[in-house]
Amino acid sequence: MIVGGRELVLHQGFVQALLELEKWAGQHDARKGRALVKRIIDFAYDVIAPFPLSFPAYTLPTAPTRPLRRAVLNRQYAVVYEVFETELVFVYAYSTHRNLGLLELPE
C-alpha cells in the first residue's frame, strides 16, 4: 500500500509485537486482543501514514543511532517507525507501561 508517496512496510518485528500484544490483551477475552490489534493497525495506516513527520523523533536506549519516530495511541501503546524517502517502515509496537530499557528493536 502506498500513502503520501511512501510504501507502507510492516517489519516482521512489528507483526511479532502485534501478536504478543494480542495475546496479552486477549488473555481473558480473545475479542479484546483482536480489537487492540485492529486499533493499532488503523492508527498506523490512518493517522501515522498520511503525516509521518508530524510525530517526534525518538531515541530508543537500545538503538540510539537509528532515525526512529514514535507515535502514541491513547497513552498506552506506542508505534515505532522509520521514515525514508520512498518507504514508511513500521518497526515495533509496545505497551508504554513496559520498561524501555528492556525493549530490543528488530534490525
Q: Where are the regions that the model predicts?
A:
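Enriched for short, Lys/Arg-rich terminal
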Residues: 69-107
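Basic, Lys/Arg-enriched alpha-helical interface segments
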Residues: 1-68, 101-107
